[in-house]
From Swiss-Prot:
Belongs to the HAK/KUP transporter (TC 2.A.72) family. Transport of potassium into the cell. Likely operates as a K(+):H(+) symporter. The chain crosses the membrane at residues 16-36, 58-78, 101-121, 146-166, 167-187, 221-241, 253-273, 294-314, 343-363, 373-393, 399-419, 431-451. Coiled coil: none annotated. It comes from Streptococcus equi subsp. zooepidemicus (strain H70). Its main location: membrane. GO terms for molecular function: potassium ion transmembrane transporter activity; symporter activity. Keywords: Cell membrane, Ion transport, Membrane, Potassium, Potassium transport, Symport, Transmembrane, Transmembrane helix, Transport. Pfam families: K_trans (PF02705), K_trans_C (PF22776). One of its GO terms (cellular component) is plasma membrane. It catalyses: K(+)(in) + H(+)(in) = K(+)(out) + H(+)(out). It is a multi-pass membrane protein. This is Probable potassium transport system protein Kup.
Length: 667
């Protein structure tokens, strides 16, 4: 990585500042929409709150944002970039060689973050639309919650429907809109706070600690379940590191944090002034003059859409990284924009839409959604903390110091987890069940890969290259193709799967001029595209190690075209002059790609559990992207050959021949 690129990553610019507002802070920036309302509702309404309760609540929010978001994520986690990419899978990539078991927190964290993504668009958009109840001209329409639901579903349908076209153009508006949003949060919060300056006492952590044991807090420690809503976007902040750079996050976070805290203080000041009024409105909207509320609702809806968009895009990135790490099924990926980082996964998009829509229909109100929201993300944060401890040790921090530091954050997050656990019975089970389903798929997929690696046998190409040469020159067999390309995910030096040689020599001898063996290796760097070639001292066997970054499309034919030209230009591969062609001067023959697909056969070596894993993985494959699509072979000549997982395990079953009796035997 060049120093110039590294400097740009750590540099803050005015444009980067604006872009960061639109990409990084959507989730945490829309938390003021519902956090204070959740606190008031769980306390029993405005009439049940006191000054001590409000001061303590705001103090808890301020110190949660400081300890968890600022110190853990902004100051520590952002240092853990994998070639300028952030997020739990990038963090796992940095430390996975330190211990095999670290894949467990990576899977749990990724699954819970993905499941949380199904709830965030639902709660943010619903909260924004419910703000129309505070607009006198529209309150009569939106007092009917069905109209809120229908409007929310319409917005979500349009949002998810537009994903296939990318967000290149409209994405440029995200930053300016969020700049206005945060400015409004800060200004309105400041104006309201000036009416009750005593709210500034909330900066003192004493009020936060006192509230946890105060009898004025009706929910005790479980109030932290609502407090945690203020920092749910911290994990997304880390995940979006690669999109905007560390320097721009460092520059923009102080502004964002101040605006958010001012908003909470302003809402708290309004609550103190109206706690005896009996008003049943969201403090966020009620704290703004009636004449401005409709504009605030429009702005809040735009902010909610931007937050949802950032989360949807983040889900695509998360899934694509899991695929590259071979812990998630392969789904079709398209790139609607010019930027490789802007991707679209149809299956994930419409699955998210279905789950999000069902969430809106099931919970109906944002209050009910808030009761279920946040449980999954506490698990994600705990898993990130575990991985961060290993990262700090890897970077030279003394193990004891790293363990103590991360234990401090783990303690805080575990308390939040316990406080949020009560949400399980109030709808939190929805995201937990979804997360468990995702974990199940990840475990099956990863375990299946491990089982195949355990049982598949490898053979040396050097031991068979003489046979391959004889086959190439054996005119008794028709030419199968000029170039035959075998795609394999297991190749080490001259060792390849036995099933590949079985396909070439045994199944039906495949005569070709050149035999290619291509292994795609996913690198820790996001945008790598390099290769190594070993021809084993021949001009008819080419072993290619293709190194692609975890965010690069694995369109093998495009890369192979360049590799062929390089080899011919360097004289290592003979030119394949074509007598019949519509392309004058064509020097490359035709290609056929062969993919070997292992299937579970009757195999005594496989345990019952291993057989279950392999059969389940085979079932999952029915809804995943085919190897043809994944490797970009839709427009190439390609063949999928099915072979038993264990070629050596075609067992001789006990069976006896019934012989005809001779005359002597009959006598």
């Amino acid at each position: 990585m060049s120093n110039a690129h590294h400097d740009a990553f750590d540099k803050a610019t005015k444009a980067g500042f604006i872009i960061a507002l639109g990409i990084v802070y959507g989730d945490i920036g829309t938390s003021p929409l519902y956090t204070m309302q959740s606190l008031v509702d769980n306390q029993g309404g405005l009439s049940q709150v006191s000054e001590a309760f409000i001061l303590g609540s705001v103090s808890l929010i301020i110190w949660t944002l400081t300890l968890v978001t600022t110190i853990k994520y902004v100051l520590i986690a952002l240092k853990a970039d994998n070639h300028h990419e952030g997020g739990i899978f990038s963090l796992f990539t940095l430390v996975r060689r330190m211990s095999r078991w670290l894949i467990i927190p990576a899977m749990l964290g990724g699954a819970t973050l993905l499941s949380d993504g199904a709830l965030t668009p639902a709660v943010t958009v619903t909260s924004a639309i419910e703000g129309l109840k505070a607009v006198p001209e529209l309150s009569s329409i939106y007092q009917n919650q069905t109209n809120v639901i229908l409007t929310t579903l319409l917005i979500l349908m349009v949002l998810f429907g537009l994903q296939r076209f990318g967000t290149g153009v409209i994405g440029k508006l995200f930053g300016p809109v969020m700049l206005v949003w945060f400015s409004v949060l800060g200004i309105s919060g400041l104006l309201n706070s000036l009416q009750h300056l005593e709210i500034l006492k909330a900066i003192n952590p004493y009020y936060a600690l006192h509230l946890l044991v105060s009898p004025e807090n009706h929910r005790g420690i479980f109030i932290l379940g609502s407090i945690f809503l203020a920092t749910t976007g911290a994990e997304a902040l880390y995940s979006d590191l690669g999109h905007v750079g560390r320097g721009n996050i460092y520059a923009s976070w102080p502004f964002v944090k101040v605006c958010i805290i001012l908003s909470y203080c302003g809402q708290a000041a309004w609550i103190l002034a109206h706690k005896d009024s009996g008003i049943a409105l969201n403090p966020f909207f009620a704290s703004v003059p009636e004449g401005l509320r409709v504009y605030l609702v429009i702005l809040a809806t735009l902010a909610a859409i931007i937050a949802s968009q950032a989360l949807i895009s983040g889900s695509f990135t998360l899934v694509s990284e899991a695929m590259r790490l071979k812990i998630f099924p392969l789904f079709k990926i398209t790139y609607p924009g010019a930027n490789l980082g802007q991707l679209y996964i149809p299956v994930i998009n419409w699955s998210l839409f279905a789950v999000t829509s069902c969430t809106v229909l099931y919970f109906r109100t944002s209050a009910h959604m808030e009761a279920a929201y946040g449980l999954a993300i506490t698990i994600t944060m705990l898993m990130t903390t575990i991985l961060l401890a290993y990262y700090l040790i890897k970077e030279g921090v003394k193990p004891l110091l790293a363990s103590l530091l991360m234990a401090f954050f783990a303690f805080i997050e575990f308390i939040f987890f316990l406080a949020s656990a009560v949400k399980f019975m109030h709808g939190g089970y929805v995201v937990v069940v979804l997360a468990l389903a995702i974990v199940f798929v990840m475990v099956i997929w990863h375990a299946g890969t491990v089982i195949v690696a355990k049982y598949v046998k490898s053979l040396s190409l050097n031991d068979y290259k003489h046979q391959i040469k004889l086959l190439r020159d054996d005119l008794r067999f028709d030419l199968y193709q000029t170039n035959v390309v075998y795609l394999t995910n297991r190749m080490k030096k001259d060792l390849i799967d036995r099933s590949i040689l079985y396909s070439i020599l045994d199944k039906r001898p495949k005569r070709a001029q050149v035999y290619w063996f291509v292994n795609v290796r996913v690198t820790d760097e996001p945008y790598t595209a390099t290769y190594k070639v070993d021809m084993l001292g021949t001009d008819y066997i080419v072993c290619v190690e293709l190194y692609l970054g975890f965010r690069m499309p694995q369109t093998v034919p495009r890369y192979l075209r360049t590799i062929v030209q390089d080899l011919m230009e360097s004289g290592r591969l003979p030119k394949q002059v074509q007598d019949y062609t519509i392309t004058p001067g064509r020097e490359v023959g035709d290609f056929r790609f062969v993919i070997i697909e292992e299937r579970v056969s009757y195999a005594r070596q496989l345990s019952t559990l291993e057989r279950f894993v392999m059969q389940t993985k085979a079932s999952i494959k029915h809804v995943t992207a085919s190897p043809m699509r994944w490797f970009g072979l839709q427009y190439s000549e390609a063949t999928v050959e099915v072979v038993p997982l264990l070629l050596s395990d075609v067992l001789k079953l006990p069976i006896k021949e019934i012989k005809a009796c001779t005359k002597d035997e009959k006598a």
